Curated annotation (Swiss-Prot):
InterPro entries: Herpes_UL37 (IPR005655), HSV_ITP (IPR034738). One of its GO terms (cellular component) is viral tegument. Pfam families: Herpes_UL37_1. The gene is UL37. Belongs to the herpesviridae inner tegument protein family. Residues 568-1114 are annotated as: Interaction with large tegument protein. Keywords: Host cytoplasm, Host Golgi apparatus, Host nucleus, Virion, Virion tegument. A motif (Nuclear export signal) lies at residues 263-272. Residues 1-51, 1046-1114 are annotated as: Disordered. This is Inner tegument protein.
Length: 1114
């Protein structure tokens, strides 16, 4: 029927907009309502038939509205703007024509119902998100403007309904404006996104509890709009922004905490920069106040925590230690690595830093020292008793608080205060997995091998990593439910071996996460919206149908129940009519023949054709359930999980859901189950969207529940009516289930393969590097090393020239650096093995599920069997790779690493003994060092006496190995011959510069071997009292003035100037002369005072020529 044939006038002021998008939910509703507009029944019709047009119109209106409310597709802003005015025009016209409560309620509450169906997708960038929200706000203003209120008033309808234009405009616009204000305030606190925050960030930011910024946006005042995509998407975006502020503010409290030691505060600052202020594109963004605070903190750190550069070059470095050492040495939190060739101090990372008598770290935040903790966890060596006591006290207290708290903010603050930041938790997990992979379980029973300290670190790090991962998206919105389910489900599989070793397997970690970070259930919001909808229906029913129930009431409540069930996992609270209560009691309202006649009229897709009195008869309910639900069940089970078959199944399910609405009661929640099934199957109509295993399980459960309802209805009709019972939805008999499970299983396999591919590549790269390093080291240690007493030479073969020389410390540093490269490759191998083991564990569990599903299918060659074979083949490949790669980590030593480890162990023992002997004041340390030398020499002689299978390497390979290991070490050049030295004389005729060579002024200084440049020698030199420039000038001036009457040499001749030790007193220098020569004679010096002759005292001696002057090294 065209619009020109309608006799109902359109309201004034309605102008049709541009053509709306085709096939949208609002466009479909508009088309359905357009076909409903017809003139009222003529008064000449017989009595009793005048109600039929109104009934048919109400049924069609109800069907169209139900399709709109229960549709899985969303309404875009463009569709809403294009269809709004024509749709409102049609509703007002229908209401003037029929005066139905359905038309009144739908027209009055259409703005709110449309807002609940509006599509919203906010981009990740704030500017784009604000622009998108402005579009939504303009759309809300357009559908709730004056044209809408005038149209409703002209039709005699309310504008102040709960979901009407006035309330929706006020509530939605106020919510959007408040959301924008809160979001902008959170963005202003982020130095990464705000230039103002970068320059004006205060170190005194108050902590922001998790979820607090969005608390005012989820108050009961917004309950009517809470399920809408506008609110849900806005809360999701706000959660991403505000949760960063929460984590950042919790960490910020520690960087200037006066109760912490300076080193602890500096380490918290570095962790803050790494976790929250470093971006891939801009690097570290450090606000000026934070930089100034860090510089002030570093100046207060005890220098004893740093190892001098000359000693640091002999030690193996790690990436974490280099990060801390570089930042502390360069006094900048931006510094992460030292430039090549830089000589820099090194921070101590030994277990002794945790000792109670060492005041470097605060006892309440020992876990903040990342390089020291990583080394402690990787090596597994127990620290001292005092350090163990401090660590256990902190770890036990932290783990107890994490276990016994159900507040996310309390747990986050507890983890952060103890030093378990997001990056630290990840690093500690990697360190412990490396320790487990290194062969510890091979020597100990399964599940053991970790010390108590390691177990506590593992428990806290595992819980902390998952808590911080959830905290980034935590919020009161439906999307967080999926995030929580995903992270919770993968928490014990991702690090399965470590979870088992620390006792968090078997659901312990999942339960801990559920207690702390479980999503909040919006029970009150949904209950408030339900009460509001019921109230609106009751109002419309009293006004237009004398209190009779509206056909749309159940539809609206089903829509709300389906939303709660599919988005929040909430079971509907409305009690459904049990099937047993529908058994006929007393005389039936209609004869069985009437029921049979009406049942024969049930045809898909017709919703009318049966008289309302028959539909409302309880005796007719089993017929509808057996036929309608049974047909829907058969159509769905026989549809393959492909777009076209699922589209047809969805139409049958929608017909079964809407059949008899308003007259036929909902039995065992069958309409809610049908609606949930439609929502779950709707993504299958879009190409490229595959099912998940969880979705397949939910759909199978709903099909089984519908089968119970249909089977019960068939049993009620017997023996009067014999209907074939529906086939139970089994995997072996349902095309939908077998195809859906097969696609879901293959989707899981694809995800596992995508995870395994980079891990295998990383594993391959690490193994190649390890092989190269091992071969190089094996060839390196096949060489013979000779010494001339001060330097080392490498001899690759008897007939080859010696390579070198190098100083011993230079060679030790080169080997240590090469070992560092080896350890980097080893860490990459450990991380890859841990990730690959997680893939193997998940694949094994997935294969078990597929085996159970495939066992339900009798015929061979089915699609599930094919997928199962693919999974089995993938598991065999990944398991084989993991098993072969794990052999490199088995045993006490990695193959090819034995000689290098022996060399490093001996080098460390000799170096420690040598340093102790030099710093000792008694003979005990010297004797211990001599004994260590003796033991080392005996060990070398014993090894040389054994016949050991040597790695067959050529002289060229050994030469290449020496060049590779010693590539960055500078050869120690021999001393320059005397001909290359420039001779300095004592000639000082300032008027004859042409007779002298100015070459010495441009020559570099050569430090003679007699000068001690060791840390002890430099410390002794720097501790002396030095002559000031003015004192030196006074002495030299006195010498020049006394040169005219030089005294003869004798007992009173002036002696050398002396440099006194620290703590001595230097006498005020005076002009030397005959009257005070006794005061400066050598015999008057205090005993034990060491003197230093001054070689440059000018003395006039014309008889001495430059050629006769002895050479002096500048």
């Amino acid at each position: 029927m065209s619009d020109s044939a309608l006799q109902v006038p359109a309201p004034a002021g309605m102008t049709p907009p541009s053509a709306p998008p085709p096939n949208g939910p609002l466009q479909v509703l508009l088309g359905s309502l357009t076909n409903l507009r017809r003139p009222p029944s003529p008064s000449s019709e017989p009595a009793g038939s005048a109600d039929e047009p109104a009934f048919l119109s109400a049924a069609k209106l109800h069907a169209a509205t139900a399709a709109f409310l229960l549709s899985g597709a969303a309404v875009g802003p463009a569709e809403a703007r294009a269809c709004w005015h024509p749709l409102l025009e049609q509703l007002c016209a229908l209401h003037r024509a029929h005066g139905l409560p359905e038309t009144a309620l739908l027209a009055e509450n259409l703005p709110g119902l449309l807002v609940h169906r509006m599509a919203v997708a906010l981009p990740e960038t704030p500017e784009a998100a604000f622009r998108e929200m402005d579009v939504i706000k303009d759309t809300v203003l357009a559908i709730t403007g004056s044209d809408t209120t005038h149209a409703l008033e002209a039709a005699g309808l309310r504008t102040t309904a709960a979901l009407g234009p006035v309330r929706v405009r006020q509530c939605a616009v106020e919510w959007i404006d408040r959301w924008r204000t809160v979001t902008q305030s959170c963005l202003a606190m982020n130095p990464r996104t705000s230039l103002e925050a970068l320059g004006e960030m205060s170190l005194k930011m108050s902590p922001v509890p998790l979820g607090q910024p969005g608390a005012n946006l989820t108050t009961p005042a917004y309950s009517l709009l809470f399920p809408s995509p506008i609110v849900q998407e806005g809360l999701r975006f706000l959660a991403l922004v505000s949760n960063w502020v929460t984590l950042f503010s919790a960490h910020l409290q520690r960087i200037d905490d006066a109760a912490l030691t300076p080193l602890t505060r500096a380490l918290f600052t570095l962790a803050l920069v790494d976790d929250y202020l470093t971006t891939p594109d801009r690097g570290a963004v450090v606000p000026p106040p934070l930089l100034a605070q860090f510089q002030h903190t570093v100046r207060e750190i005890d220098p004893a925590i740093m190892i001098p550069p000359l000693e640091a070059t002999k030690m193996v470095r790690s990436r974490e230690e280099v990060r801390v050492s570089t930042a502390l040495s360069r006094v900048s939190p931006r510094s992460a690595c030292a430039p090549p060739g830089t000589l820099m101090a090194r921070v101590r990372t030994d277990a002794a830093v945790f000792d109670p008598d060492v005041p470097f770290l605060s006892a309440s935040a020992l876990a903040i020292f990342r390089p020291a903790v990583t080394g402690l966890l990787q090596l597994g060596e127990p620290p001292s008793a005092g350090a163990q006591q401090r660590l256990l006290a902190l770890l036990q207290q932290t783990w107890a608080l994490v276990q016994n708290s159900n507040s996310p903010s309390v747990v986050i603050n507890t983890l952060t205060d103890a030093g378990f930041t997001p990056a630290h938790c990840t690093q500690y997990i990697s360190a412990l997995e490396g320790f487990l992979v290194a062969g510890v379980p091979a020597r100990t029973p399964p599940g053991h091998g970790l010390s108590e300290i390691q177990q506590l670190f593992g428990c806290i790090a595992l819980a902390g990593a998952n808590v911080f991962g959830l905290a980034r998206e935590y919020g009161h919105y439906a999307g967080y439910v999926k995030t929580f389910r995903r992270i919770q489900g993968a928490s014990e599989h991702t690090h399965g071996r470590l979870c088992e070793a620390v006792g968090l397997s078997g659901g312990v970690l999942s339960q801990t996460l559920a207690r702390i970070m479980g999503p909040a259930v919006p029970t009150e919001h949904l209950a408030s919206l339900r009460r509001t909808l019921v109230g609106e229906f009751e109002t419309a029913e009293r006004r237009f149908s004398a209190g009779q129930p509206s056909l749309l009431r159940e539809t609206a409540l089903i829509w709300l129940d389906v939303y709660g069930q599919t988005h929040w996992d909430l079971t509907p609270t409305t009690p459904a009519t049990p099937l047993s209560a529908l058994l006929p009691v007393g005389p039936p309202s209609h004869a069985p023949s009437v029921h049979l006649a009406a049942a024969t009229k049930i045809r898909f897709p017709a919703l009318e054709g049966i008289h309302p009195n028959v539909l409302a008869d309880p005796g007719f309910v089993p017929y509808v359930l057996a036929l309608v639900v049974g047909d829907a069940l058969r159509a769905t089970c026989n549809a393959a999980y492909l777009p076209r078959p699922i589209e047809f199944a969805l139409r049958v399910l929608a017909w079964a859901r809407d059949f008899g609405l308003g007259y036929l009661p909902t039995v065992e929640g069958h309409r809610t189950k049908l609606g949930a099934l439609i929502t779950l199957l709707e993504p299958a109509t879009r190409a490229g969207v595959g099912p998940t295993m969880q979705m397949a399980d939910n759909i199978e459960q709903l099909l089984r529940e519908l089968y119970v309802i249909a089977r019960g209805a068939v049993e009620q009709l017997r023996p009067a009516v014999q209907l074939p019972p529906p086939q139970p939805p089994e995997v072996g008999s349902s095309l939908l289930l077998i195809s859906m499970y097969a696609l879901a299983a293959r989707g899981v396999l694809q995800e596992l393969a995508e995870r395994a591919d980079p891990l295998v590549r990383q594993l391959e790269d690490a193994i190649v590097l390890l092989r190269l390093h091992m071969r190089t080291l094996a060839a390196f240690f096949e060489c013979r090393f000779e010494s001339d007493g001060h330097r080392l030479y490498a001899v690759v073969a008897d007939a080859h020239e010696r390579l070198g020389p190098w100083r011993p410390e230079a060679m030790g540093d080169a080997v240590s650096q090469y070992c560092g490269m080896y350890h980097d490759a080893k860490r990459a191998l450990v991380a890859s093995l841990a990730g690959l083991r997680s893939v193997v564990t998940e694949t094994t569990a997935h294969l078990g599920v597929c085996d159970e599903l495939a066992a339900q299918v009798s015929h061979e060659g089915n699609v599930l069997a094919v997928v199962r074979r693919e999974i089995h083949g993938f598991l065999a490949i990944v398991s084989g790779i993991h098993a072969r790669a794990s052999k490199l980590m088995s045993g006490d030593q990695v193959p090819g690493f034995c000689y290098m480890s022996q060399f490093l162990a001996r080098w460390r023992r000799l170096s420690a003994g040598y340093q102790a002997a030099r710093a000792a004041t008694g003979p005990e340390r010297v004797a211990e060092f001599v004994q260590e030398l003796h033991d080392t020499w005996k060990g070398l002689q014993t090894e040389r006496a054994l016949v050991v299978a040597r790695f067959a390497s050529s002289a060229d390979q050994r030469t290449a190995a020496i060049q590779e290991v010693m590539a960055h070490a500078t050869e120690d050049a021999p001393p320059s011959p005397a001909a290359d030295l420039v001779v300095l004389t004592n000639r000082h005729d300032l008027g004859a510069w042409g007779d002298y060579s100015l070459g010495p002024l441009g020559q570099p200084t050569v430090v003679p071997d007699s000068v001690d440049l060791s840390p002890q020698g430099l410390a002794a030199t720097l501790s002396m009292d030095w002559l000031l420039i003015n004192e030196l000038l006074q002495v030299t001036d006195g010498v020049f003035r006394a040169s005219a009457f030089r005294p003869s040499a004798g007992p009173g001749a002036p002696g050398d100037l002396e440099a006194q030790d620290a703590g001595g007193s230097t006498p005020e220098p005076t002009t030397p002369g005959p009257q005070d020569t006794q005061a400066r004679a050598p015999s008057t010096r205090p005993a034990g005072r060491e003197t230093v002759p001054w070689p440059n005292t000018p003395v006039e001696d014309d008889e001495m020529t430059p050629q006769e002057t002895p050479p002096v090294h500048p």
